[in-house]
Amino acid sequence: MARISGVDLPREKRIEIGLTYVYGIGRVSSNRILAKAGVNPDTRVRDLTDEEVAKIRDVIDETMLVEGDLRREIALNIKRLQEIGCYRGIRHRKGLPVRGQKTKTNARTRKGPKRTVANKKK
């Protein structure tokens, strides 16, 4: 089992797909990493040699932020926006959509389940 950036890659999958199990690596960046490391994307994870795994690990370490470091950087960016009090930071703090979406009807993912408000008695 190949272990890269603290993640065990699935043995049966192609390395091109297996790398996407690491947070911060998608299909495009996976192919870019494999090209730099000189590894065939169609190779199964179980068939990789230790040298190939080491090459892939080196390329990832020198060029990308992945897993915990990436999560930490994203959290710090959001925290910074909240501290400076900009519009995006306020939206993050209130748990509302940040990128200009309308909130009159939808936005349930960001707002959470509906909370029904009781009507006033006449």
From Swiss-Prot:
Residues 95-122 are annotated as: Disordered. It comes from the Bacteria. One of its GO terms (cellular component) is cytosol. InterPro entries: Rbsml_uS13_C, Ribosomal_uS13, Ribosomal_uS13-like_H2TH, Ribosomal_uS13_bac-type, Ribosomal_uS13_CS. Pfam families: Ribosomal_S13 (PF00416). Signal peptide: none annotated. Keywords: Ribonucleoprotein, Ribosomal protein, RNA-binding, rRNA-binding, tRNA-binding. The keyword Transmembrane helix does not apply. Disulfide bonds: none annotated. Belongs to the universal ribosomal protein uS13 family. Part of the 30S ribosomal subunit. Forms a loose heterodimer with protein S19. Forms two bridges to the 50S subunit in the 70S ribosome. This is Small ribosomal subunit protein uS13. It comes from Lachnoclostridium phytofermentans (strain ATCC 700394 / DSM 18823 / ISDg).
